[in-house]
Regions:
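Inter-Walker segment of RecA-like/P-loop motor cores
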Residues: 121-169
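Walker B catalytic acidic pair
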Residues: 174-175
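ATPase catalytic-site recognition across NTP-hydrolyzing enzymes
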Residues: 186, 238-294
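Post-Walker A helix-loop "phosphate-sensing" segment adjacent to the P-loop in P-loop NTPases
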Residues: 96-103
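ASCE P-loop NTPase helicase motor core
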Residues: 128, 134, 178-254
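Pre-P-loop entry segment of helicase/translocase ATPase cores
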Residues: 1-74
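Conserved Walker A/P-loop ATP-binding site and its immediately adjacent core
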Residues: 103-122
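Walker A/P-loop
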Residues: 72-92
């Protein structure tokens, strides 16, 4: 019915629209609610560069990512470029918004335009869900969307100003290594108290490395068990079709240094330093044996 669509978009159901569920619909809805991997595999559609709109056929490491997001409150993921990290993350965030009421999700990236692009991918996936699985739409914009189950998703740049005064159930930080150190520190001092006050709130950090900065520190601490983040690392060879020949071709088209950072996920310095980045990397990043304070000279 035309009156049941949101602002003339036939792919969206407006708020407070009644849907007749079949017995099969109810079974599927409950199955999807319990299993975000099944939901993504069966119902998420993505835009492929060559083929247009296609089902999301997940690789094993993408399934593992979604399971980790679902099981753990704090996730930090170090991933090479072009591994479908955005699509994987977006499918989990969409699952969370549909199957949980009255939750707020923040999609934050190093640039506002990147965050809005991620939200756009989520909205494309949402438009291609069957109507019986959709929540009704209250508001639908380039920077946010509100569902009639009370859930809201907003996209912005990673900054304290973007989230100040707001409460989030999930914060997703894309390419967090590319956020300047001082902005990242300011952001966490603003947002962490509200996240840590909940029992089921989540922070998901996904990035390729960029030198030895805040992301390097958080990743290193997660590996050592010094913080609560569960670290997940993906190797470029886990993507089907990427082999030694692909590596050689990519290095030939770019550079070995670029390949090490963007695909091997090495924390090399982003600029030439007096001490070679490979030497800096070999030096252990450990807590000092003793910290002295209040020394007056």
């Amino acid at each position: 019915q035309q009156s049941d669509v949101y602002l003339g978009n036939p792919n969206l159901k407006k708020a407070n629209t009644e849907i007749q569920f079949t017995e099969e619909n109810v079974k599927e809805f409950l199955k999807c609610k319990d299993d975000p991997v099944y939901f993504a595999r069966q119902y998420i559609k993505i835009v492929n560069v060559d083929e247009g709109l296609v089902p999301f056929e997940m690789w094993p490491f993408q399934e593992k990512l979604i399971k980790n997001f679902h099981k753990n409150r704090f996730n930090i993921c170090m991933m090479p470029r072009q591994t479908g990290k955005s699509t994987t993350s977006v499918s989990y965030l969409l699952h969370y918004a549909i199957f949980n009421d009255n939750i707020n999700i923040g999609i934050l990236a190093n640039k506002a335009a990147t965050a809005r692009d991620l939200l756009g991918r989520l909205q494309t996936a949402y438009e291609n869900l069957p109507k019986w699985m959709q929540q009704g739409i209250v508001a639908w914009n380039k920077g946010s969307m509100d569902l009639d189950n009370g859930s809201k998703i907003m996209a912005a740049s990673t900054s304290a100003a973007a989230v100040r005064g707001m409460t989030f159930n999930i914060i997703f930080l894309d390419e967090f290594a590319f956020v300047p150190n001082h902005i990242a520190d300011d952001f966490f001092s603003s947002v962490y108290p509200t996240i840590s006050s909940g029992k089921s709130t989540k922070i998901i950090i996904v990035s390729t490395p960029k030198g030895m900065n805040h992301f390097y520190r958080m990743w290193h601490d997660a590996e050592k068990g010094r913080n609560e983040y569960v670290p997940t690392e993906v190797h470029w060879s886990e993507v089907p079709g990427r082999d030694a020949k692909w590596k050689a071709q990519t290095i030939a088209n770019t550079s070995e240094q670029q390949f090490k950072v963007e695909f091997e996920c090495e924390f090399l310095g982003s600029v030439d330093t007096l001490i070679a980045p490979s030497k800096l990397k070999a030096m252990a990043y450990n807590d000092p044996v003793q910290t002295l304070s209040l020394i007056h000279i």
